Amino acid sequence: MYIALEGIDTAGKSTQIELLKNEYKNNILFIKEPGFTKFGTKIREIIFNDDISKKAELFLFLADRAETIEKFVKPNLHKNILTDRSVISGIAYAMEFFDFNMLVNLNKFATDGIFPEFVIILKLDKETLQYRLSQKNHDNIEKRGLDYLINIQDNMIEVCNRLEIPYLLLDASKNIEEINFRIKKVISEYMDID
């Protein structure tokens, strides 16, 4: 089973992934986008720190996704895979600038049509997002602002709906343990865990 954990910046994905790794490290392959491969680490550095065009950014994300899918997802589709970000957020971020159908086709090409089978979206309200962003330095994506990130969050839901990928929406302002409990419930329901 291939599940994606999605959410905008500061939603708590990384925190949840670390908690899940501690519990399921022997049962789930944990990956992330961008930057899971050596190649992807270089791409991540460029995307988040260099001043590049939106089109260049899109193709770098696609290159990272293609590499991760080819080297880690495809050979392990018979296993449990949990990814921190996926094609869902890739399309959600890019559809602010590019046509949805074109993005779907580019991502189908990059992934050989392998999309997550289920998505968990951590959703933040505007006030919580504003507070969390005020507590950190911003990368190039976060510098686009509060309204941009809230739109991306809505886009993630739209992408799941349009691609007909089942998803669960979780309130990311809840406490870490409650969110973790809900995610583990999904894992036990959808993944074959020994």
Curated annotation (Swiss-Prot):
E.C. no: 2.7.4.9
Keyword line: ATP-binding, Kinase, Nucleotide biosynthesis, Nucleotide-binding, Transferase
Disulphide connectivity of cysteines: none
EC supergroup of this enzyme: transferase
Transferase keyword on record: yes
Catalyses which reaction(s): dTMP + ATP = dTDP + ADP
One Pfam family linked to the record: Thymidylate_kin
Functional summary from the UniProt entry: Phosphorylation of dTMP to form dTDP in both de novo and salvage pathways of dTTP synthesis.
Descriptive protein name: Thymidylate kinase
Organism of derivation: Nautilia profundicola (strain ATCC BAA-1463 / DSM 18972 / AmH)
